[in-house]
A protein has these predicted regions:
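Residue-level signal for the membrane-embedded core of alpha-helical transmembrane segments
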Residues: 59, 113, 205-208, 272, ...
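Short, intrinsically disordered terminal tails adjacent to the first/last structured region
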Residues: 447-451
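12-transmembrane solute porter fold
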Residues: 6-22, 27-29, 50, 243-445
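Hydrophobic transmembrane-helix bundles of small-molecule transporters
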Residues: 158-262, 269, 288, 294-295, ...
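Small-residue hotspots
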Residues: 87, 103, 110, 176, ...
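Transmembrane-helix bundle of Major Facilitator Superfamily
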Residues: 1-182, 309, 316-317, 324-331, ...
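Residue-level signal for alpha-helical transmembrane segments in multi-pass membrane proteins
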Residues: 90, 175-183, 209-212, 230-237, ...
């Protein structure tokens, strides 16, 4: 039976990793107020504060994972937590648009340090027999934190003011830091290497071009094509350098590909939904923010239930069928959600939110565990960074598509909100197809070796 230290370490890592999705979604319910403070329409404010957060996060994931391989996952995690606290304090103490944008960038960069290195710590610090359970709880925590973010943000905004959303991060991060410092083992064996700055800059330009191509009232094909070309050049470069920021050979493992696709397209739908709902009910139904946050509790609780169930289902019916079943439940939940015309109050969509939350919580953990176990332990940082990159890229793309469909007017219409649903369906279809890349049994894949 795992010792007490192991469970305390797991608790610290989970608290740390939850900060990243909380930072991106806790302001969802408060966006109308924040947009008014910034004197912008809600769509533009969402792109700047949420899309920008996700953009910086996704750019930093792979380099941060590589940095953790070099300096140690604990040190990288400590740096991330410290910067996250500093950015949160700035956002709370200084009430200006410029400082708010700077603090969000700091929090985004910090979240990029936190997530891959938290995941890598699970891979390297916990017994291998405990990993499926640990990644199940890890995935459930990330999903639940993203879903509970609007609930927490709504309550803080209702009873205090929107800057209180940032203050809560400080004691949260301090508790996580204390648990990890006390319980983690030193990372004795570190890989000798360096962070390739040229590759890092190239990756930043590639992802930045892709993201910026979806900002505005229409897609900028020049930026999108430029981003694809730069990303292709980045991959070509990584296959030829001695110390890649991310090793594309990981995608030789079908389980890793499935983990990446499930993470990316699952987050595409989840993030867009979390930010669509407050805008829909405020603009179209004139509902108070606190009522919207309360309805999202259904998604939160079902995600928390789906995570642990993932490991159980994986043992009983295998990884492939667990992931496939979860994808089908998710699609059925979306079918129920598509009847937005009948949703007069947030409580009307509790059932579809609960189904989609449970399905998301059930699919992600078992697939991520399979993907991480397919990669050598000493490359856990890079592997986790790659999956985190796909997670945030999916979320950022979801936010961008949502903003494109809702337009730049000060208020939105029912028809605009309905026009987003086919994009959700397409994303969930890719999640379903990814399940067929997984092995039927839950035996881990053989880790890849260097070519």
């Amino acid at each position: 039976m795992p010792e007490k230290r192991t469970f305390l370490l797991l608790a610290g890592v989970l608290l740390a990793s939850a900060l990243a999705p909380l930072g991106s979604t806790s302001i969802a319910v408060a966006m109308p107020q924040i947009a008014a403070f910034m004197e912008m329409d809600p769509g533009t404010a969402t792109q700047l504060l949420v899309g920008g957060y996700l953009l910086i996060s996704v750019i930093g994931q792979a380099p941060a994972g590589k940095l953790g391989d070099i300096i140690g996952y604990q040190k990288a995690l400590y740096i991330g937590l410290a910067v996250f606290m500093l950015g949160s304090l700035l956002a709370y103490l200084v009430r200006s648009i410029e400082v708010l944008l700077i603090s969000r960038m700091m929090m985004a960069a910090a979240s990029a340090m936190i997530v891959p290195n938290a995941s890598a710590m699970l891979r390297t610090q916990l017994p291998e027999s405990m990993l499926p359970f640990a990644y199940g709880i890890f995935g459930a925590t990330m999903g639940a934190a993203a879903a509970v973010g609007p609930l927490l943000g709504g309550a803080l905004t209702q009873f205090f003011d929107w800057p209180a959303i940032f203050l809560i991060n400080v004691p949260w991060a301090l508790l996580a830091l204390g648990l990890i410092v006390i319980t983690s083992k030193p990372q004795i064996e570190k890989r000798k290497g360096r962070l390739d700055l040229r590759s890092t800059v190239l990756l930043a330009f590639a992802i930045g071009a892709l993201q910026l191509g979806f900002i505005g009232d229409s897609v900028d094909l020049r930026l999108v094509v430029s981003g694809v070309l730069l990303l292709s050049f980045f991959i070509w470069m990584q296959l030829r350098v001695d110390e890649p920021v991310f090793d594309p050979r990981f995608f030789k493992q079908p389980a890793y590909v499935a983990a990446g696709f499930t993470t990316a397209f699952g987050n595409f739908t989840m993030y867009a939904l979390l930010f669509q709902l407050p805008i829909f009910f405020v603009d179209v139904r004139q509902v108070a923010e606190i009522e919207i946050a309360g309805a999202l509790t259904a998604m939160t609780l079902s995600m928390m239930l789906g995570g642990p169930m993932s490991a159980v289902a994986g043992r009983l019916i295998g990884i492939r069928y667990t992931a496939g079943l979860a994808a089908c439940v998710n699609i059925f939940g979306l079918y129920l959600y598509s009847d937005l015309e009948s949703a007069l109050v947030p409580m009307d969509i509790i059932a579809p939110l609960a189904l989609m939350g449970f399905a998301g919580g059930m699919a992600g953990p078992v697939v991520q565990a399979a993907g991480m176990l397919a990669i050598e332990k000493d490359k856990a940082g890079m592997a986790a960074g790659g999956l985190s990159t796909m997670r945030y890229l999916g979320g950022a793309l979801g936010i961008s598509i949502l903003s494109l469909r809702l337009g730049s007017e000060s208020t939105t219409t029912l028809e605009q909100h309905l026009s987003v649903i086919p994009y959700y369906l397409g994303a969930l279809f890719f999640v379903l197809m990814s399940a067929f890349l997984l092995p039927v049994s839950n035996k881990k894949a053989d880790p890849i070796e260097d070519s």
